[in-house]
Amino acid sequence: MSDSEGGLASEVEHEKRSRSTSNRPNYAIDTEDLDIDENDENEDDDYREEEANEGVNEEEISDEEEQINKSGRNKRRHVDEEEDLSEDKGVTRSRNRSKFKKPVFPGIDDAEENLNPLKVVNEEYVLPDDPEGETKITADGDLLGGREFLVRTFTLTEKGNRKFMLATEPARIVGFRDSYLFFQTHPNLYKFILNQTQKNDLIDRGVLPYSYRNRQIALVTARGVFKEFGAKIIRGGKHITDDYYASELRTKGNVIEGKLAGDPIDKSARALETMMYPASENGINPAKNQVEFFEHRPHGHMSNSNIIASGSKLSSTNWLYQHSAACSRFNSDLFYDRVKVLLVDQQGLRDAYTNILHIPESTQSTTVLGWRRSKNDSPSDTSIVYETVIHDNDLNKPKTGLSEIPKEIYEDVVDEDVLRAITEQQNFEKCNEYI
């Protein structure tokens, strides 16, 4: 074996021994040919520490690992002790959050505020009153001086004459799509949740649709909404003139008195619809069209009460409502025209597929009462004129053909109520059998 091969073998053997004594690789620098002062002050202290720890044997390391494995909670306990120590040193944390919202309203400085929740009286927070604002609204929420709300108001049976609003309606007026952000942004408003009895009462009175029966409905008082928004919730409202806290707004000078309040309509097209077509006092849905069929009105009988917005008023918020309202109107028009043609004009209904004129069977003659020859000044006119007289007690009542059914079929089979109904129908058909 040559000297070079022997030297290489000795280096490999030395490396194996080094790895067997320690899991760490040997990063020692060969300083044999380097001129380094042993008393150098800039010598790396980390290198000395690593070199001193190089002699740790595997048994000590394995014992330490075994001890950690036996107590898997050492690290967690150590972290908990550090947290307790930090708390003892004065590190404070807020572990509970206040469940009460902190209303913000004019008239109270930050120095006077505290974390105590405000009192709720008559379903609204007790906020400071403005003498000038009290001349614009009553305690029940009725506006004074000819002012009108942009949204409808109604009362609850057990709340007397106090006026309320659906929270979603003023929310849309001021630019919110729902009431969640409405209450989060305006904590001065108290959220009053209806119970099932109150919802049923409003549904029976026509204020709420039946689909709201199983939903959570939030109300706000009309007085509270006026205090919060002032002229923005008033039809044609003007700054300071129609605001509740007029004195403070006049002092701040942020708005010009008498100028029209900012128009929030562009933020919500549904608000535009509410302003142009406000809900009726009894809460009837304007999409439902009550048609009286036997009035001789023109074809465009709904032009005066058109509730369908034009294309420029459609948006991502109200398109579904506008589509539903248009379908409701179209169905009403079809039904009105069909009944008018059949029963009023007596012209029949032409089928678009077969081009056949259909006439109700109840309007056709069943017998000839007589014929006569009329005197005609024109001898060449040999036409025949049919004069048909229709006599029917009720055109809307169908003819079922019960008058032709013998009594033996249903006697002793049906009860008295059904028998009475059959007899009435038979008598009706017999009276109108011959024209």
From Swiss-Prot:
It is found in: Nucleus. One of its GO terms (molecular function) is chromatin DNA binding. The modification Phosphoserine is found at residue 86. Belongs to the RSC7/SWP82 family. RSC7 subfamily. Residues 30-66 have a biased composition (Acidic residues). One of its GO terms (biological process) is nucleosome disassembly. Component of the chromatin structure remodeling complex (RSC), which is involved in transcription regulation and nucleosome positioning. RSC is responsible for the transfer of a histone octamer from a nucleosome core particle to naked DNA. The reaction requires ATP and involves an activated RSC-nucleosome intermediate. Remodeling reaction also involves DNA translocation, DNA twist and conformational change. GO terms for cellular component: chromatin; nucleus; RSC-type complex. Transmembrane segments: none annotated. Interacts with ARP7, ARP9, RSC3, RSC8, RSC30 and STH1. Component of the two forms of the RSC complex composed of at least either RSC1 or RSC2, and ARP7, ARP9, LDB7, NPL6, RSC3, RSC30, RSC4, RSC58, RSC6, RSC8, RSC9, SFH1, STH1, HTL1 and probably RTT102. The complexes interact with histone and histone variant components of centromeric chromatin. Component of a fungal-specific module (HTL1-LDB7-NPL6-RSC3-RSC30) within the RSC complex. Present with 3510 molecules/cell in log phase SD medium. Residues 248-435 are annotated as: Functional region. Keywords: Chromatin regulator, Nucleus, Phosphoprotein, Transcription, Transcription regulation. It comes from the Eukaryota. This is Chromatin structure-remodeling complex subunit RSC7. InterPro entries: CRC_Rsc7/Swp82 (IPR013933). Residues 1-97 are annotated as: Disordered. The gene is NPL6. Its main location: nucleus.
